Each structure stands twice: as structure tokens, then as C-alpha cells.
Amino acid sequence: MKKLILGLLSALALLPGGMLRSGDVRAAETFAVQSPRRDHCANPHANCHGERYEDRRGRYTKDSWSVYYRGRKVEGASVSSFADLGGGYGKDNWTVYYRGRKVEGASVSSFADLGGGYGKDNWTVFYEGRKLEGASAMSFEYKGRGYGKDPWKVVYQGREVPGASSSSFEELGWGYARDAWKVYYCGEVIPGASPATFRIPDRR
């Protein structure tokens, strides 16, 4: 494809009237050679309304001797008992890991990935491998797009959403949410927005 484009540019440069100057051709050649490729390892969801987390499976790998997370050795992990839980979490018979690092205080026997960076065991809720203080492990739910809640509070990406009503809270998509009194975007109140009528229009 690059050869075809350069060939066409060279032909245009030779036409009467000089539709393209030789300098333009050289610039185009330089652009064609130096234009960067899209980084296939870049996170395509690096924004507040997208899911910033791994696919449900596939980031952990292992051979006969070691476990790896995205090419980096997971120190101390047991190859024989290791399981990928999804969302960056994994565990062996003794330890829970998040993105290859130990999750302190997590119970291996009851730990589960909830999605969106959240996980929990029978006693504690975690966000990105850190304890989410004050959250009820028994009743905590991940609602999507970074939002989670228990019967007493709402959180967004591990931070409490001040004043949000858990009982009426609803995640709407694309970072938007509402309760009976307010509308939120990425965990922040949208001043003046009406929760009763707020909606995300369909795309045409």
C-alpha cells in the first residue's frame, strides 16, 4: 500500500504544471515512513465512562515454573493452583493477586471478582486490590461503569459519591447515573439536571 501511494505521488509530480512539487513528494515519503502505528497494547478504555479493566480472562499466563501478568513474573505465585479470576484478579491456594501484586488481607477461599476493578471476599470489599473501607461485603454490588453500592452508600471508582441515595440509585451508561434527587456524571453531580426526565438519546 505504501509503495502504491508513493508511486501515485511521484506520477503527479511529473504531470504538466507540477501538481505536486518534488518537496511535497519527499514530505509525503517521510510521513509514510515515519507515521506511528497504533499501539496495540494501549488501553482502549482509558476514560471515565469506559470500563478500564482487562477482559474477563487472558492477562495472566503461566509455564511449568512461573505465573506471569502481562509478561511480568508474579513473585511467589503457585503455578499448580493458580487461577485467573478476571478483571486483573487472580489467586492460588494461598494468595489473591491484583495485576500481579498481592492483595493484602484478602481471603482466598471466598474471593471473587465483581468487575470494574472491584472484588470481595466474605468480609471485605476491594477496589483495584485495596480495601474499600466501610463497604458491606455481604451486600455490595457492582452496578457497571465504575459505580458500585451497598444499602448505605454509592461509590464511583472506589470513592464515595457524596449524598447519593443508594436505595434509588441507577446506573445509566457512559458514566451517567441518577438517584431520586440528582444526576451524576463520573461520580460528580450535574447541577440542575432533572433525574425524573434525564435520559441518554438513542444514536441514529
Each predicted region: which residue ranges?
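Positively charged n-region of N-terminal signal peptides that target proteins for export
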Residues: 1-4
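Bacterial N-terminal signal peptides
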Residues: 7-17
